[in-house]
Structures are given as structure tokens and as C-alpha cells.
Amino acid sequence: MTHWFHRNPLKATAPVSFNFYGVASTQAASKICSDLRSTRARLLELFSDITCNHEMMKNATDAYFSLLLGFIDSLDGGTQDNKLRYIQNFKWTDTLQGNAPSAQQDAVFELVSMGFNVALWYTKYASRLAGKEDITEEEAKEVHRSLKIAAGVFKHLKENHIPKLITPVEKGRDLETRVIDAYTVQCQAEAQEVTIARAIELKHNPGLIAALAYETANYYQKVDHTLATLDPVYIAKWRSYTQLKMCFYMAYSYCYHGQTLLSADKCGEAIRSLQEAEKFYGKAEALCKEYGETKGPGTTAKPSGHLFFRKMGTLVRNTLEKCQRENGFIYFQKVPPEAPQLELKANYGLVEPVPFEFPAMTSQWSPETHTGFDLTKRPKDDSAKPKKEEEVKPMKEPDIKPQKDSGCQIS
């Protein structure tokens, strides 16, 4: 499913040296600083490494976060702030608002910002995997799992760590509730797309497919309503994507609901449902063009050129023609003026985020190691010195080249 998913850019960050000269007064403390520097650099490299997989990402995130938590969590399990939490300044850009960075001298800001990028990596990994020419069933499961993991990371950051920030989150930026909610729900919607493709491939009950498509359309509508409250300059392209996906899955829902009605000998209602499917499919086609022409951050999906998209149009037309033929020969039922109300609830296949937890603090941290950081040795005028601004360069991301499209490949 090459270019089926819209992706915003990764967050970029300024280099961090963790050079606490004089403060890191023991060999163990200096080793912590060195390991923080190297594990952070390694994790940032993997974000743009096309060969990176789940295992590599987990190992890298565990290595860095298990060290970083020694700057945040209390070693004795208490609630008192760790003395090292505010020792280092961190700068991060935003996925939507370009290269103007936000900066906070707070290790929690680093934790949630890097964690946000980890979640984004899982979404991009899923998109890249779904774009393979001959995706296997196991790879399709990996796409599904990656999106659920990403949703779990976003949810965990929002509920457990972002509230701990001392500096309030700026409105419309990544860590704000509306933005992180939009990312979370989009991950759930995209994972359900994989479920729908699988259900179609295995020819499951049309009622189940209609219900799943309806739930997925509602997810995309929820994302769109959330984005509508943000600055349109930054989210116009993202909104076009969510709107076209909403219309596409509403078309799917009405199409398969029409099949269910036909099997229950309600041919007139089936025709009306298929007419509604045709209307939503037409809207989705128009929105595909609008999306492609809308400027904004992120990669551009190309769903209208995808066989999965085109198959839907053919299915709607063929099913509608079949219903009309059957009605002319057998049923002779009136077609209702109003489209049927979809009150569909999927009992199977709904996606929930995979619960996420940061790793435990590394055993390198001990009371002795912690004591090895002597904050009294910090230069007294440290904060008053004019510092050279570190440039925050955009994160390099691998190109995803379209491959031969052989249809509904994620199933």
C-alpha cells in the first residue's frame, strides 16, 4: 500500500554533549555522561536508518531511556525531584510548526520529546513496510502491531509524563493534548484499515466489514474534528487526509451494508445504501485531488492511484448495478428517499493501543553514582553566560519509493 498513509516529519533536536565538567566528579558519573551521549546519538541515527526494525529500536530506546531516567526518577522511590532533572537544556522542533525549536532545561521534556519521536518512528516503519511490493501475512501483522505500539506510546506520554512538565505546553505544538490525541486516534484508525483489508481478503461477513469501516470512518472524523481547532496554516494538509479517509471508509460501510440489506431481501434499501456509497466515494476522489494540491508538512499519500482505492469504486458500481437488476426482475421495491442510518457496532477487530512503559532505570545508577554528580561545582555564572545557539537541523528521513502496486497487499 505504497503512499497510502500520510506522515508528518520527525521532530529534530539540537546535539546534547552531557559534558558536566567538574560536576561529574567520579569515574562512574563520567561514564554515565559518556553513555548518555552515545546512546542518544545512536537512537537519533536509527530514526532515519531504513534497515532499523522493532528489535533494534527497542534495544536503542531501552539503552537511552534507562540512563535518562536516572536524571528524573528518585533512586529511593520517593516523590522528591531528582537533583539532576534540571541540569541540562534540551531543544526540540515540532512536527507541524517547522524548525523553530522549543527549549526546556528539564529532563522530562527530553523524555517526552524523544518518546514522541519513537512513536512517530513506529508509524513510519508501518508505512514503509506496507509499501513493499509483496508484503507477507507476517509483515501485515507487523504493520498492525507497529501502529498499535505507536498509539500506546502517545497515550502513555499524554497520561503519565507530559503532565509532569514544569513549563506549560505551548498551544498547537506536539505535546499539547489536541495534537497528541490526533496522532493516537489516527494510529488506531490506520491499524483498523489493516483489519478491514484482512476481513475483505478472507471474505468475512459483510455486516462485520461494514461495521469496522464505519468505526474507522468515525475515528478519522474524530481526528478531523480535533485538528479543526488548531491553526489551519499547519494542519490543512493533514485534515484533507483525514477527510478523504473518512469519506472512503463511509463508502465502504454503505457498500457492505447494502450487501447485508440485499441478503435480507431489502433490495430497495440496498440500492439507497449503494447510492450513498457512490456519493461518498465521489467525495473521496475529489478530496484526493484537494489533498495532493494542499501545501503543508509531511509526506504526500497517493491513495487515488492505489488499486485498493480503485477497487472500491468498481465494487460500489458493480454492487449497485446488481441491486438495480435484482430489483427490476424480482423485488420491485421502492428506493427510500433517505439513506439508511448506520448504527453499526463492530464486536470484533477494534483496535486498542498496546500498553507502553519506559524501561527500568539501568543498574549503572546507584546512590554512589548519583552522589558523584556534585552540583556545587557548577559555574556560578553558568546561566548568565551568553551561549552560542545550537542549530537544530531537520531530521533526515529515508525516501519511500513507490513500488509496483499489486492491490490490497496488507491483508
Curated annotation (Swiss-Prot):
Q: What Gene3D superfamilies does this protein map onto?
A: alix/aip1 like domains
Q: Which GO terms describe its biological process?
A: mitotic nuclear membrane reassembly
* Propiece residue ranges: 409-411
Q: Does the keyword Lipoprotein apply?
A: yes
Q: Region Disordered: start and end of each range?
A: 362-411
Residues with Cysteine methyl ester modification: C408
Give the record's GO CC terms. nuclear envelope; nuclear membrane
Role played: Nuclear envelope-associated factor that is involved in the nuclear envelope ruptures during interphase (NERDI) repair.
Tell me its family.
Belongs to the BROX family.
Q: What is this protein called?
A: BRO1 domain-containing protein BROX
Biological source species:
Xenopus tropicalis (Western clawed frog)
UniProt lists the gene as: brox
